[in-house]
């Protein structure tokens, strides 16, 4: 059987799994639709959040912009991550405390102002459409590669799938499908890392492999550590002036 047929089978099974989870966890109340009923286990929430972070609009895009723009691209990474942390710490807990489902509802009731509510709606729309544009583009690129269709068709396929389980299951369905997505993603990320670490250092644990020596062609230690090799990569990419610590912060940003 050709590789393309196996790809179609794998994609079909994964889609069926996500749709099955959405049907199983479909929302039966307004609270379940907006906040998954408030009863999702913290570990499951963490897995869903991690899967959302490892998506086309965040992790892949951040890696891409750093690859194309070099050190200047890290500004977007710090802003994205910092804003995410601030949102999780300063806003999300109070939504639950006030019993609200959306940020505009919380802002409007917190400041007793419909004008503030309108501003929050406008900001939410701008942020959401910006995020969705990147996410859907990434989905289209992935589907165009795997299903051998054009990017526009891939975008529409992704939209139909997301629309199905989002409308049917709400946040509850999305959360549990993201948990399944996390399992797929973490497997896809860890397997290459484990085998690369095993091939380069002879240690199957990537975190421990950082302190090991790079193996030579005969499988013996070369006397050069992995960290030294990574430092050499930083120098080759032009990051040395910003990581060696020999200049002041003012000089680096000037």
Name each model-derived stretch.
Residues 19-26, 63, 135, 142, ...:
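Transmembrane helix-loop junctions and nearby membrane-interface residues
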Residues 2-3, 38-40, 44, 61-75, ...:
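Loop-to-helix junctions at membrane interfaces in multi-pass transport proteins
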Residues 25-29, 33, 67-70, 94-102, ...:
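Membrane-interfacial segments
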Residues 19, 50, 74-169, 222-241, ...:
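Helix-loop-helix module between adjacent transmembrane segments
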Residues 13, 17, 58, 83-90, ...:
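Membrane-embedded alpha-helical core segments of multi-pass
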Residues 26-27, 56-59, 63, 88, ...:
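Alpha-helical transmembrane segments of polytopic integral membrane proteins
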Residues 1-59, 166-169, 212, 220:
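Membrane-interface "cap" regions at the ends of multi-pass membrane proteins
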